[in-house]
Amino acid sequence: MLSQLIEIPSLSREEDKTADLLQAFFEKQGVSVNRQGNNVWARNLHFDSSKPTILLNSHHDTVKPNQGYTKNPHKAIIEDGKLFGLGSNDAGGPLVCLIMSFLHLYDREDLKYNLLMAATAEEEVSGAGGVSSILSELGAIEVGIVGEPTLMEMAISEKGLMVLDCYAKGRAGHAARDEGENAIYKAIKDIEWFRTYQFPKQSEKLGPVKMSVTVIEAGSQHNVVP
């Protein structure tokens, strides 16, 4: 299964073929499966709404392969007992482990909890079509186990993500004359605020909240005030 996932390109928002693979795999195992977009999920055979539910979740989308690859990223290669390929670690390996654990317990009648297995999409881009799009379909969840590469250590907390697209509005003018209002100069003050601001609250486990300015776009010509 992991080798198949590696060899099917599944960039974020383009995971339809790996979603097809996962859906077919569950169905072949006799598991009733649900799908919305490229999110695939299933419940244990003896699901009981009076019991607490444990969510098993990981994602099947990947980032683009970087230029440093020395092997074919879309070829599952085993060397020295290790499996190489794009998504083998993040997060195909954890995903397959969770799926196999789910199947191992799928038809048990004596479980004190329900199991909900969700293989989700668009994780790498925090996309609207990812896990957040199906939360209302999953029902109440007591606790979640998320498969991610954590060096085989249990991780009990994680920083969230908020992306801000900020705009500074200027007025165009010729760069050689004292005219226009430079949007870059306006933005510098705000960029410095992002760099120096300290939030009053800190996480006991993760420390202070960090804000970083990562992309700046401005101007169209060297001689025009943006």
Feature map (PLM): residue ranges:
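Predominant activation on well-ordered alpha-helical scaffold segments within soluble catalytic domains
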Residues: S3, Q23, V96-I99, L103, ...
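Phosphate-handling active-site elements
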Residues: E79-G81, S101-L116, F194-E204
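Short glycine/proline-enriched loop/turn "hinge" motifs that connect secondary-structure elements
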Residues: N66, A155-L161, H222-P226
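Glycine/serine-rich anion-binding loops at beta->alpha junctions
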Residues: K64, K82-C97, H174
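Acidic-enriched catalytic cores of C-N bond-cleaving enzymes acting on peptides and small amides
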Residues: A176-V225
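Acidic/histidine-rich catalytic neighborhood of metal-dependent amide-processing enzymes
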Residues: A91-V163
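Acidic/His- and Gly-rich active-site-bordering loop/insert found
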Residues: M1-L86, R108-L111
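Buried hydrophobic positions in well-ordered alpha/beta secondary-structure cores of metabolic enzymes
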Residues: P9, F26, A42, L56-H59, ...
